[in-house]
Amino acid sequence: KRPLLKTDKFDGFIIGFQPCRPSSRGNIRLLSKEINDEPLIDPGYLSNEKDLYDLECAYDFVRKISQTHSLDNIIDHPIGIDLIKSSTKEMISHFRQNATSVYHPCGTCKISPDKNTGVVSDRLKVHGLQNLWIVDASVFPNITSGNINAPVMMTAYIGGNLISEDIKKLT
């Protein structure tokens, strides 16, 4: 199920690229009211023109690097599809079919003072509900440019204080 986690049994290297701040947005939909039913998750990869432009720029850069004298001498053959010799249209099609996340999805319950543009308030309380807070990476209004561990810990620290304050007001 997760082919990227399998170790290859041959020598090779990868020239990769990824957007640090993609503009494309996906969505999560509940298919039923049953708690054990899985939601429908559409990550929406490459659904934004800016992300497609960034992909083309990165692809052109990798193509140029791959054709330098230094790498030309060590590249024997591509593994799988030869993206270096593919057209931009073929490359985009390949990426649409194969692109995945680097396992740090976030931003599905955005912080916003307005319930029409976000799920939680600046106190991390779910709009329209009482005594329900969300304190994880889903509240990020923007995707960070790096690993989300530190921002999640900061959110948890601040969220814990906010929840404590709110509960004290209730008692």
Show the residue positions of the predicted features.
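FAD-dependent oxidoreductase catalytic-site/capping-region signature
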Residues: 1-151, 159-171
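ATP-dependent carboxylate activation and anion-phosphoryl transfer catalytic cores
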Residues: 156
